[in-house]
């Protein structure tokens, strides 16, 4: 859609975000997990979603690999495609936040500008940047998908951390040590959500 198309207008609906949040008994936010491949983003996000589900929190997890099977299946890994990938995910996450959900996203999202773009789209107070900080050597040793091995062999180009830059967050809402136990990291995230009055259980 062209931004200047005067025939396309925004429709307001009678049920508000606040009413949806009252229905869910918690606030709608996005927790944006970022870090290198193999840092533990998806693992921690999945464990957190499981913990939140047990507490009765309405959640949805958007995973970097999964969205490329559908929503972003037409995109590659050029800088332009990566930016569009994050833009689309940001729009979907924003809709889910407006539905009153706690949205968890697990994406490398290597560039600060793109993460800032999503933050501005979702809005301050509803965007929580989660930096899963795991040393490259540890990520490479884990290499669950064998991607680092391929990148080192020259079989995979533009791989973040090897021949493509990762811009670490400078002021994430929470900075996790990716070498700690997953259970410890989940507890840190639950504590943050409670301290910020996002969940009450």
UniProtKB/Swiss-Prot annotation:
Belongs to the APS kinase family. Keywords: ATP-binding, Kinase, Nucleotide-binding, Phosphoprotein, Transferase. It comes from the Bacteria. It catalyses: adenosine 5'-phosphosulfate + ATP = 3'-phosphoadenylyl sulfate + ADP + H(+). It comes from Shigella boydii serotype 18 (strain CDC 3083-94 / BS512). This is Adenylyl-sulfate kinase. ATP binds at residues 35-42. Catalyzes the synthesis of activated sulfate. The keyword ATP-binding applies. Pathway: Sulfur metabolism; hydrogen sulfide biosynthesis; sulfite from sulfate: step 2/3. Its EC number is 2.7.1.25.
């Amino acid at each position: 859609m062209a931004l200047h198309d005067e025939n396309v207008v925004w429709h307001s609906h009678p049920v508000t975000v606040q009413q949806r949040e009252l229905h869910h008994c918690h606030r709608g936010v996005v927790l944006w997990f970022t870090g290198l491949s193999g840092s533990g983003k998806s693992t921690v996000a999945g464990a957190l979603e499981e913990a939140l589900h047990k507490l009765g929190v309405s959640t949805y997890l958007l995973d970097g690999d999964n969205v490329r099977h559908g929503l972003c299946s037409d995109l590659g890994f050029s800088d332009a495609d990566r930016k569009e990938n994050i833009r689309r995910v940001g729009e979907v996450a924003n809709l889910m936040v407006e539905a009153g959900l706690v949205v968890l996203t697990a994406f490398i999202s290597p560039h600060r500008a793109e993460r800032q773009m999503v933050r501005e789209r979702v809005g301050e107070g509803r965007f929580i940047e989660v930096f899963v900080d795991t040393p490259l050597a540890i990520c490479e040793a884990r290499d669950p998908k064998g991607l680092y091995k391929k990148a080192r062999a020259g079989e995979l180009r533009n791989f973040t951390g090897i021949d493509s830059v990762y811009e670490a967050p400078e002021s994430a809402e929470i900075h996790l040590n990716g070498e700690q136990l997953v259970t410890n990291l989940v507890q840190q995230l639950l504590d943050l959500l409670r301290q910020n009055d996002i969940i009450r259980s």
